[in-house]
Amino acid sequence: MTSGTHVAFASVLYLGGATLFGYKPDVVGWLLAATASLGPDVDLPTSKVGRLLFWLSVPLERRFGHRTVTHSAVGLLVVALVASPLWWVRPLYFWCVLGGTWSHLWIDMLNVRGADLFWPSPVRVVAPGNRNWRLEVGSKAEMVLLSVLLLLTVARTRPGHGTRYGAQTPMPSTAGRCRTHQCERGFREQ
């Protein structure tokens, strides 16, 4: 899948998780999930993260190939260990990194090739079972999926996140203070 599809899918899962689990979405968590959704492609030197971390990407691809160790439960465990300090800072951020990484593995299973989720086992996980329904990287079908994911992301974004009213969301209500302030200045509540 393309990096845009990975980021869009992680965004949908992050915002959907806010509804499901009741946490308040914030920009840091969203960025962590989106960034982590690109992480498993570190084993591909031509990917965005592979170009950034070329010193790690090239040896990983030579030794293991693409969609093997970094797209497996072993890779997910390594990410969990590396991200574990976030648990002590803010547990939600730990889950954002883990969820973003998992979203990458999950959506790559929709690809024709699938993912080696149980690496080093040769079992490859693909979905759906019908090969004709799987997606080619960069195909029209993937662009349709990307469009749907972007629409879902926009639909899940609450007003006040990135709009001109964005500053109102983090600010506490001043309704009680205004009444108190008005009463102190001699105004009587009717």
Short names for language-model regions:
Residues 1-190:
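N-terminal membrane-targeting hydrophobic helices
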